[in-house]
């Protein structure tokens, strides 16, 4: 996984979104803005990207995206239920056509037997009401996990929502 691949995906997503007149948004936790950075590294990205959110804390997920406090308490931030609510929340907050959300444990600390370091949950939502969630287990150091998560996010958004 490389930054070059992330850049290539951003270019491809930008072209596809521009052709459709669509907007994409993102709500990031463990990637800390890496997805938004990759998108905005592309010249002209203001034609398909208006805003993204870095919601690192549970309070930010709740306050900015409307993730239920009970969902956060019951399932934890790194869960299918939370990324589902994050994706819908950011889609609504940004008024976008496609939304990506990500929450995971990049390491080196913070993992558990149930959710080891490298566990990342993803949420994707479209203005058509469709929501998709996915879980991945990545290996490597913190930077590698974050990069793999950003690439997976863009690959999946492109394949399942933008080109579909």
From Swiss-Prot:
* Molecular function, one GO term: nicotinamide-nucleotide amidase activity
Annotated signal sequence range: none
* Keywords in alphabetical order: Hydrolase, Pyridine nucleotide biosynthesis
Protein origin, superkingdom: Bacteria
GO terms for biological process?
A: pyridine nucleotide biosynthetic process
InterPro entries to which the protein is assigned, alphabetical: CinA-like_C, CinA_C
Task: Give a yes or no for keyword Hydrolase in this entry.
Answer: yes
**Xref: SUPFAM superfamilies:** CinA-like (SSF142433)
Does the entry feature the keyword Hydrolase, yes or no?
yes
* Official protein name in the record: Nicotinamide-nucleotide amidohydrolase PncC
Q: What is the lineage of its organism?
A: Bacteria, Pseudomonadati, Pseudomonadota, Gammaproteobacteria, Enterobacterales
What gene codes for this chain? pncC
């Amino acid at each position: 996984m490389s930054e070059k691949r992330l850049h290539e995906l951003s270019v491809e997503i930008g072209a596809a979104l521009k052709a459709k007149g669509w907007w994409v948004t993102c709500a990031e936790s463990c990637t800390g803005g890496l997805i938004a950075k990759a998108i905005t590294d592309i010249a002209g990205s203001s034609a398909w990207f208006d805003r993204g959110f870095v919601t690192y804390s549970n309070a930010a997920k709740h306050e900015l995206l409307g993730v239920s406090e009970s969902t956060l308490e019951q399932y934890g931030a790194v869960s299918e239920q939370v990324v589902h609510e994050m994706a819908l929340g950011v889609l609504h907050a940004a008024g976008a056509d496609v939304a990506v959300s990500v929450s995971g444990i990049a390491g080196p600390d913070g993992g558990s037997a149930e959710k080891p370091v490298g566990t990342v949950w993803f949420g994707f939502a479209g203005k058509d009401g469709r929501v998709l969630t996915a879980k991945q287990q990545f290996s490597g150091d913190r930077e590698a996990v974050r990069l793999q998560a950003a690439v997976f996010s863009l690959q999946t958004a492109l394949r399942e929502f933008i080109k579909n």
